[in-house]
UniProtKB/Swiss-Prot annotation:
InterPro entries with a match to the protein in the record: 3-OH-isobutyrate_DH-rel_CS (IPR002204), 6-PGluconate_DH-like_C_sf (IPR008927), 6PGD_dom2 (IPR013328), 6PGDH_NADP-bd (IPR006115), HIBADH-like_NADP-bd (IPR029154), HIBADH-related (IPR015815), NAD(P)-bd_dom_sf (IPR036291)
GO MF annotations in UniProt: NAD binding; NADP binding; oxidoreductase activity
Organism: Mycobacterium tuberculosis (strain CDC 1551 / Oshkosh)
E.C. no: 1.1.-.-
Record keywords: NAD, Oxidoreductase
Protein name: Uncharacterized oxidoreductase MT0794
Binding site for NAD(+): 11-25, 101, 252
Gene3D superfamilies: N-(1-d-carboxylethyl)-l-norvaline Dehydrogenase, domain 2 (1.10.1040.10), NAD(P)-binding Rossmann-like Domain (3.40.50.720)
Presence of the UniProt keyword Nucleus in the record: no
Active site residues of this protein: 176
Biological-process GO terms, alphabetical: organic acid catabolic process
Protein family (similarity comment): Belongs to the HIBADH-related family.
Length: 295
């Protein structure tokens, strides 16, 4: 195992809307914090809080665990592999954690490229937004080797209350992309529901209040995400009665919504697709002798 200090020095690159509240949670880290942002004014509050402002990315390379929260793959690659980037100056054993949402192949490629130098590339995208970061309640999905994951757990726990070791480098990003896919598909579904409600002359703001209120109790889509496989359930699975009940309710309500859409002349393609795929998606597909309900 690579030798490393008992209390590592931390570095943070990128102090924007997401990075700033995360880095702020590290100001009292006993090993110290070095920050860098291309905007000098973004670093000023951190210097006032006791952090060291770096003059360039290369100065941050002196840290032992370095977090990066920049915009996209190109910026991530530039910070790490440019002529004056982290890869040129970081010592063996350094952990570079990428919190930006990037392509999974970017993390894999960087990890392979820097492995001979003894530099650990960790993809650690977060979920929860700036508000959760400020409270230390982010979820972080980590793609890392076992050694690196153990080393980042304590500092990352300053800004995250849920740390998931998703697997090797690239796995954290894959989990984040699946999570974000659910978010944005649900946004599209929300827009479809609003079109139906609007065509029925309903108050859309009131509908939003109902959705937020009920989701705070039911948990939204996450409420059915407890299985460790998407394969059809075994007959004796203890969750089967619950999900068969959910299937029945879902197919009934989706059928009613689609029928209402026909009455008010609103196309509901996501609802139609949901009706077709709900049973199999829940792991309780209809037997061949029991076709799914259709409108």
């Amino acid at each position: 195992m690579t030798a490393h200090p008992e209390t590592p020095r931390l570095g943070y690159i990128g102090l924007g809307n997401q990075g700033a509240p995360m880095a702020k949670r590290l100001l009292d880290w006993p090993g110290g914090l070095t920050v860098f942002d291309v905007r000098v004014e973004a670093m000023a509050p951190f210097v006032e809080g006791g952090a060291t402002a770096a003059a360039s990315v290369s100065d941050v390379a002196e840290a032992d665990i370095i977090s990066i929260t920049v915009f996209d793959d190109a910026q991530v690659s530039s910070v790490i592999t440019a002529d004056n980037g982290l890869a040129t100056h970081a010592k063996p054993g350094t952990i570079v954690a990428i919190h930006s949402t990037i392509a999974d192949t970017t993390a894999v490629d960087l990890a392979e490229k820097l492995k001979p130098q003894g530099i650990h590339i960790v993809d650690a995208p977060v979920s929860g937004g700036a508000a959760a970061a400020a409270k230390g309640e982010l979820a972080v999905m980590v793609g890392a080797d076992d050694e690196a994951f153990q080393r980042i757990k304590e500092p990352f726990s300053r800004w995250a209350s849920l740390l998931i070791h998703a697997g090797e480098p690239g796995a954290g990003t894959r989990m984040k992309l699946a999570r974000n896919m659910l978010t944005f598909v649900s946004y599209a579904a929300a827009a479809e529901a609003q079109r139906l409600a609007e065509a029925c002359g309903l108050d859309l703001v009131a509908l939003g209040k109902v959705v937020r209120h009920s989701d705070s109790f039911t948990g939204g889509a996450g409420a059915i995400m407890f299985r460790n496989t998407t394969a059809p359930m075994e007959p004796a699975d203890p969750l089967r009665p619950l999900l068969e009940h959910t299937r029945g309710l879902g197919e009934k309500d989706l059928s009613l919504a689609l029928a209402l859409g026909e009455v008010v002349s609103v196309d509901l393609p996501l609802a139609q697709l949901a009706l077709q795929r709900l049973a199999a998606g829940l792991g309780v597909p209809h037997p061949d002798t029991e076709p799914a309900k259709e409108t």
